[in-house]
Amino acid sequence: MSSTQAQASKTLYGERVIAEGELICFDNPRPERPYEISIELPEFTCQCPFSGYPDFAVLRLLYQPGSRVIELKAIKLYVNSYRNCTISHEEAANKILDDLVVACNPVWMQLEADFNPRGNVHTVVRVSHGSRQPC
């Protein structure tokens, strides 16, 4: 067995699934009706670009779908892909929102990244796209 094959065989199932993941959407079953979808992802992790320490956050996504809806397993795997990513709180929230907007083109979307306090500092980053419609 070559060293490349040995390395590939050491890749854990979850790591492989995360690496292969993509944001998948499906057709909105009720595109004529304004409604909101709320998704909470309580286990977001990334790495601080300054200290290298892990950062933990709860992501709260609220959106009004257009013609497409985000598939839940796909968003879970996408969010898990940030685990070893060195990125600031602000860039993480903005990049995630941008990627979700490209994937599903919502009428309106808001992402709140509520980071666990570290060093007595609690950070919440809230970003949005589009105009919220009455439901």
UniProtKB/Swiss-Prot annotation:
It comes from the Bacteria. Pathway: tRNA modification; tRNA-queuosine biosynthesis. The active site is at 48 (thioimide intermediate), 55 (proton donor). It catalyses: 7-aminomethyl-7-carbaguanine + 2 NADP(+) = 7-cyano-7-deazaguanine + 2 NADPH + 3 H(+). It is an enzyme of class 1 (oxidoreductase). Substrate binds at residues 70-72, 89-90. Coiled coil: none annotated. GO terms for molecular function: preQ1 synthase activity. InterPro entries: GTP-CH-I_C/QueF (IPR043133), NADPH_dep_7-cyano-7-deazaG_red (IPR050084), QueF (IPR029500), QueF_type1 (IPR016856). GO terms for biological process: queuosine biosynthetic process; tRNA modification. Gene3D superfamilies: 3.30.1130.10. It is found in: Cytoplasm. The keyword Cytoplasm applies. Its EC number is 1.7.1.13. SUPFAM superfamilies: Tetrahydrobiopterin biosynthesis enzymes-like. Keywords: Cytoplasm, NADP, Oxidoreductase, Queuosine biosynthesis. GO terms for cellular component: cytoplasm. Belongs to the GTP cyclohydrolase I family. QueF type 1 subfamily. Catalyzes the NADPH-dependent reduction of 7-cyano-7-deazaguanine (preQ0) to 7-aminomethyl-7-deazaguanine (preQ1). This is NADPH-dependent 7-cyano-7-deazaguanine reductase. It comes from Prochlorococcus marinus (strain MIT 9313). The lineage of its organism: Bacteria, Bacillati, Cyanobacteriota, Cyanophyceae, Synechococcales.
